[in-house]
């Protein structure tokens, strides 16, 4: 909905369905709002509430740039996906999540099906009472971790069995998602950002995985803040130039 204002032929954006959709789906995701970047969230809300421009072409340009900004920021949010390939590794996940107590680890993907094309995928979401098993058809990793036209990529993917997870590692490399892989000396080192050799049943290995997960979370948050500042400064200047 667009409303014309008096003076200098300004146009005020009263409501924009696209931005509201992005705001509701990408910033809440069915979880509490405080779990995500409050500065970014407040900025988007401010832009939704009142946007002033002069010409319709400029309006379309600014809205397109804002949507691109949101899409880029979503890619670098500090969320970590952990992939386990068997029940023993799944128990390692539970211990790590319990130790972390971080909202960024609420979502996990589990089972060997995630690392192979032909098997069904089983997505485990942490509920109030343990884990809920949801069986879904194989959509490969791009569809699994993304939304149509608005991919929300995690900061890192932790693969607790990199030997069986070659397909997942390749897909992550194509999508530009950093990976942490655990396995023996036969794992594909070039495509892994952080390879860990040996099993992770020992306290030392679990500590290493935990440390890398924390690093991944903070790295994702750092990238999020950096790219947001870059886009914000660039398009704020462009936006103000249309008001002169």
From Swiss-Prot:
Belongs to the universal ribosomal protein uS2 family. Its main location: mitochondrion. One of its GO terms (biological process) is translation. It comes from Dictyostelium discoideum. InterPro entries: Ribosomal_uS2 (IPR001865), Ribosomal_uS2_bac/mit/plastid (IPR005706), Ribosomal_uS2_flav_dom_sf (IPR023591). PANTHER family: 30S RIBOSOMAL PROTEIN S2 PROKARYOTIC AND ORGANELLAR, SMALL RIBOSOMAL SUBUNIT PROTEIN US2M. GO terms for cellular component: mitochondrial small ribosomal subunit. Keywords: Mitochondrion, Ribonucleoprotein, Ribosomal protein. It is found in: Mitochondrion. The gene is mrps2. GO terms for molecular function: structural constituent of ribosome. This is Small ribosomal subunit protein uS2m. Pfam families: Ribosomal_S2 (PF00318). The keyword Secreted does not apply. The keyword Mitochondrion applies.
């Amino acid at each position: 909905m667009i409303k014309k204002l008096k003076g200098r032929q300004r146009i005020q954006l009263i409501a924009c369905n696209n931005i509201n959709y992005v705001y509701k789906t990408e910033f809440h995701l069915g979880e509490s709002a405080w779990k995500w970047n409050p500065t970014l969230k407040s900025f988007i809300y401010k832009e939704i509430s009142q946007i002033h421009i002069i010409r319709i072409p400029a309006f379309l340009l600014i809205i397109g740039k804002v949507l691109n900004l949101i899409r880029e920021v979503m890619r670098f949010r500090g969320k970590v996906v952990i992939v386990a390939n068997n029940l023993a590794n799944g128990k390692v996940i539970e211990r790590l999540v319990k130790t972390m107590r971080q909202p960024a680890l609420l979502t996990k993907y589990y089972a060997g099906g995630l690392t192979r094309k032909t098997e069904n995928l089983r997505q485990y979401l942490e509920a109030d009472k343990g884990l809920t098993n949801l069986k879904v058809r194989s959509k490969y990793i791009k569809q699994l971790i993304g939304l149509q036209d608005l991919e929300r990529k995690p900061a890192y993917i932790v693969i607790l069995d990199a030997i069986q997870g070659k397909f997942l590692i390749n897909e992550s490399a194509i999508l530009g998602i950093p990976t942490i892989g655990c396995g023996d000396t036969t794992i594909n080192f070039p495509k892994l950002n952080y390879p860990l050799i040996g099993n992770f049943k020992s306290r030392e290995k679990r500590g290493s995985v935990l440390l890398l997960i924390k690093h991944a979370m903070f790295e994702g948050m750092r990238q999020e803040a950096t790219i947001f500042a870059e886009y914000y400064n660039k398009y704020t200047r462009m936006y103000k130039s249309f008001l002169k």
